[in-house]
Regions:
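Active-site neighborhood of phospho(di)ester-bond hydrolases with catalytic His/Asp-centered motifs
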Residues: 32-36, 78-88, 107-110, 209-215, ...
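Binuclear metal-ion centers of metallo-dependent hydrolases, dominated by the metallo-beta-lactamase
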Residues: 105, 113-138, 267-342
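Active-site-proximal loop/helix segments of hydrolase catalytic cores
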Residues: 179-269
Length: 342
C-alpha cells in the first residue's frame, strides 16, 4: 500500500541529544538517529587497538533512561523512523529500545537489524541498506544512503575500523538479558558506516543536509570491500549521491570534528554550515550534560578559511531550524527543563 504523505515541509528542526544522537522533526515525521542514551562504564571495555574490542560482562539497555528522553521530546508516537550510521554500541545500543517504545521502523546496516532482532524486534521492521539507496521519507523529502567508512586505521585498530558485519542474531545473556557491547563482539561497525544525505523540496524551496557519525581520512578514497563485494570508496559514493540529487552543495553538514576528514569532505560537499557531533565523550552521564565546550582550532580555522560557518552546540538538546535560508538556533526550553539542562 502506498504511504500517504502530507504537504512538503518548509523546514526541519534538528536537536542534538549527545554524541551523534540526533532528533529530526520533518513535518509530521520525527526521526531519531543513533539514539544512544544508555551509558556503559569505560572499565567494562578492554582489548584491541582502541581498547573497545571486548567487554567484561554483558549489559542490557537502560530502558528507563531512553523512556525519559523520549517522553521529554513529547508525542512519542511521532517518532516513526530510527536511523543508525554504524553499529558500535555508542550508536545502536538503544535502537531496539526506541523501536519497542515507539513502534518506529529502523534503517541501518545488517548488523543493526540483527542486533534489533536479538532484542525482540521483528525482522520486517528493520531495513538493511548498503549504500546507493534513495528512500522517500515524506512528501518532498528524500534520503540518500552513502556507504562510508569508520574512524581509525587498519594498521592500528582494525577491529574498530575495518568493515565487519554480524552474520547471525547475537544471543542475549540468559541472566541479564544483555548483549556484549565490544566492537569485536555483538557490536561491530556493521560493514563500515552509512552516511545519509537528506534533500527537502519544501514549500519555499529546496534545502539539504548531510549526516555522518564517523570517518577516517586514512582510506576515505579507498573502496569498501566486504565478503567479496565492492561497495565503492566513500568520497566517490558521496560524489555520486550529490550528483544523483542534483546538488552542488548542502546547507548543513553534521559530522565528527576532524580536520583531515574535513579537508577531504568539504571540497565535495561544499557545506554552508557545519554542526560538529561526537566530540563530547562516550562515558559521561547523559544527565550531567556537556562537561566542556566544543573547541577544535584545526577544524574551525579550516572551515572559516573555506567560508563554512561553524554551528557550535553548547548543551544537550540544543536545537536549530534549517530551511532554504540556512540554519539558526531556536529555543528548546521545555525539553531542557524536563531533562535538567536549563
Amino acid at each position: 500500500m502506498a504511504r500517504a504523505f502530507a504537504a512538503p515541509p518548509a523546514f526541519v528542526d534538528i536537536t542534538w541529544m549527545s554524541i551523534s544522537n540526533m532528533y529530526y522533526e520533518i513535518g509530521s515525521l520525527d526521526v531519531v538517529t543513533d539514539g544512544y542514551i544508555t551509558r556503559l562504564p569505560q572499565d567494562a571495555f578492554f582489548g584491541g587497538g582502541g581498547g573497545y574490542a571486548q567487554t567484561r560482562r554483558p549489559f542490557p539497555p537502560d530502558v528507563a533512561a531512553v523512556t525519559r528522553v523520549m517522553n521529554a521530546l513529547g508525542q512519542p508516537s511521532r517518532v516513526g523512523l530510527l536511523l543508525t550510521g554504524h553499529s558500535h554500541w555508542d550508536h545502536s545500543f538503544d535502537t531496539a529500545t526506541w523501536s519497542k517504545l515507539t513502534g518506529a521502523r529502523i534503517i541501518g546496516s545488517r548488523t543493526t537489524c540483527l542486533q534489533a532482532q536479538a532484542e525482540g524486534i521483528p525482522a520486517e521492521r528493520c531495513r538493511s541498506v548498503n549504500g546507493g539507496e534513495a528512500i522517500p521519507l515524506a512528501e518532498g523529502v528524500t534520503m540518500r544512503v552513502v556507504r562510508w567508512n569508520h574512524s581509525g586505521d587498519p594498521a592500528l585498530n582494525p577491529e574498530q575500523h575495518n568493515p565487519v558485519e554480524l552474520n547471525a542474531v547475537p544471543v542475549r545473556d540468559p541472566a541479564t538479558g544483555g548483549l556484549r557491547a565490544g566492537v569485536a563482539e555483538d557490536f561491530p561497525n556493521g560493514g563500515g558506516n552509512r552516511a545519509y544525505l537528506f534533500i527537502v523540496d519544501g514549500l519555499d524551496g529546496r534545502f539539504s543536509w548531510f549526516f555522518n557519525n564517523s570517518a577516517s581520512a586514512v582510506d576515505l578514497h579507498v573502496p569498501i570491500v566486504l565478503d567479496g563485494v565492492n561497495y565503492g570508496a566513500p568520497l566517490e559514493n558521496l560524489k555520486s549521491a550529490m550528483r544523483d540529487a542534483k546538488l552542488a552543495s548542502v546547507d548543513l553538514w553534521i559530522g565528527g570534528s576532524a580536520a583531515p576528514v574535513a579537508k577531504l569532505v568539504v571540497p565535495v560537499l561544499k557545506p554552508k554550515a557545519f554542526l560538529p557531533v561526537h566530540w563530547d565523550g562516550l562515558f559521561g552521564a547523559f544527565e550531567a550534560g556537556v562537561q566542556k565546550p566544543y573547541a577544535d582550532a584545526g577544524v574551525e580555522d579550516f572551515l572559516k578559511a573555506s567560508g563554512v560557518a561553524v554551528v557550535k552546540p553548547a548543551q544537550y538538546m540544543d536545537k536549530w531550524r534549517l530551511d532554504r535560508t540556512g540554519v539558526r538556533p531556536i529555543a528548546n526550553t521545555e525539553v531542557k527543563k524536563v531533562l535538567g539542562f536549563n
